[in-house]
């Protein structure tokens, strides 16, 4: 990471591999949550068909499965068919995350520009023998921009933001390897990943297993992950008061999906995450958080395919609560429409969060724990987006996605004073997949 003039990015502990994606659920990291490779089986509801149909599904079954399978990014939990992939798959994805500039009337000092992040992902997955598969995932993030340093009072007494006033540059590389074993009624996977950047290093290990009922109508999934992270902040013009800190995180998940009918499927899951170590943000002036953090999330999903419309209704809900006093609700509605041009899925997501116990708009430092990070405040947010996926041939698939995220204090379900640094952003991505024997 290179700091041009004054300070570096804001930092928060990252989520582990078994933890569902955080956007709209957990206090979002300064970087956008890692969006896992969009490959067959990743981030979909496990759908099971009678064994006699597994070999050559009808066109209708293929379209039903395609429409039912999509889960929102923030709720992706891996699910796989009980056989290794029939083909080797190579995928490349580019994403762009761009935050709006801070409003001029909310700025006291520094740059109004905020983060732009370019994310490039490459993955390769293929079968090994009759019962195994292996996958390699590589992700590179390049980030530039500025971030809030602290919140103070302007001359008229209103809360305003003191920004870094500098362009921050950061590059992160993450490499992960997953091996998976398949048997008649289930599968199990083991993933090892390592992430490295100038001031942050993390190594994680994740294990998951899924198994089916005798009639293949119900699938249970459980997973566990552990991550060991090390933070070594880089000193800038604005001083950082720590040299090295560590964070350990463990996460567990259990869920079940049930085929309700030929055209409907439902899912419910429970996730528990525990972190211990350094959880404060060293690049903020007034930030001293507890050294433990417990989080629990209950997620549900429902898919209903309409044969006449050749489309499916997608409904997802998640409730989240943690030991810092934060809880939140996330509701997403989507409509996956099959057409001659592919699968088009517009979606709308609503999110509302209660502020942490120790959050203050202008943080007072005379208490054991304090923070003025807007990500810990009370607010509501709306995301509107759409994704389009099209098979160009039997070997090539392309997917495009774009979404707009807007947050406001008044949109939330909970009381709390508005944080002046609330963020709005655009996110776009393009994904190309190649399958071959």
Annotate each PLM feature.
Residues 90-94, 136-138, 190, 220-224, ...:
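Membrane-embedded beta-strand positions of outer-membrane beta-barrel proteins
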Residues 94-100, 140-144, 183-185, 192-198, ...:
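Transmembrane beta-strands of outer-membrane beta-barrel pores
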Residues 101-109, 147-153, 191-193, 200-208, ...:
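Outer-membrane beta-barrel translocator domains and adjoining extracellular loop/strand segments
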Residues 103-104, 139-175, 219-277, 347-389:
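Outer-membrane beta-barrel translocator/channel fold
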Residues 105-111, 160-165, 191-195, 206-208, ...:
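Extracellular loop and loop/strand-boundary signature of outer-membrane beta-barrel proteins
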Residues 122-126, 177-181, 207-211, 254-258, ...:
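Residues on the lipid-exposed face of transmembrane beta-strands in outer-membrane beta-barrel proteins
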Residues 132-134, 185-190, 215-220, 262-268, ...:
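Repeated loop/turn-to-beta-strand initiation elements of outer-membrane beta-barrel proteins
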Residues 422-437:
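Outer-membrane beta-barrel "beta-signal"
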